[in-house]
Amino acid sequence: MAEVEAALPVAATETPEVAAEGDAGAAEAKGPHKLQRQWTFWYDIQTKPKPGAAWGTSLKKGYTFDTVEEFWCLYDQIFRPSKLVGSADFHLFKAGVEPKWEDPECANGGKWTVISSRKTNLDTMWLETCMALIGEQFDESQEICGVVASVRQRQDKLSLWTKTASNEAVQVDIGKKWKEVIDYNDKMVYSFHDDSRSQKPSRGGRYTV
């Protein structure tokens, strides 16, 4: 949406060159704030699957963005977990990465998971995580795929997906940083996607922080 502003007179002591430089600086400040990479919102409204339907058929791609302004517009209008009802998920992943175990970026990875029993807590943790991701606040940002907010009847979950599950040192560093980001004091557990695929999850998770 274009903005219309009244033109301000240039001070008599300013040369046209100085005034032009000032105008250019102001225009740059008002322009969109670009992110280091593109990100994509996804959503998954889960209903009773049809017989023979493949997993992930309800997963839909939402919007891809690359500016701070676009993120806030999408978050405020649509992608807030408390707006979800029933069994549904919101995902924020790097553009080009699908929130599926089968995606090459996720295939050998895993996830840190936290539980939330209150929608307000989930909203806050989701927002803080999204801002940390798009703001590249993690030292191991190349290892992160994205985050998933899962709303369920009994309790909600937030999961941070990463690429290389076998690299314990990196995953532990990411887990510790994430706890700081969302101000989480309870134990956090990391599980391998391979364990979930085999339906034999490691008891208590592979790593904890």
Swiss-Prot record:
Subcellular location(s): the record lists:
Cytoplasm; Nucleus
Does this entry carry the keyword Nucleotide-binding?
no
Disulphides:
106-145
Q: Which Gene3D superfamilies match?
A: RNA Cap, Translation Initiation Factor Eif4e
Q: Where is the composition biased (Low complexity)?
A: 9-29
The annotated subunit structure for this chain is:
EIF4F is a multi-subunit complex, the composition of which varies with external and internal environmental conditions. It is composed of at least EIF4A, EIF4E and EIF4G. EIF4E is also known to interact with other partners. In higher plants two isoforms of EIF4F have been identified, named isoform EIF4F and isoform EIF(iso)4F. Isoform EIF4F has subunits p220 and p26, whereas isoform EIF(iso)4F has subunits p82 and p28.
Task performed by this protein: Component of the protein complex eIF4F, which is involved in the recognition of the mRNA cap, ATP-dependent unwinding of 5'-terminal secondary structure and recruitment of mRNA to the ribosome. Recognizes and binds the 7-methylguanosine-containing mRNA cap during an early step in the initiation of protein synthesis and facilitates ribosome binding by inducing the unwinding of the mRNAs secondary structures.
Q: What is this protein called?
A: Eukaryotic translation initiation factor isoform 4E-2
Source organism per entry reads Triticum aestivum
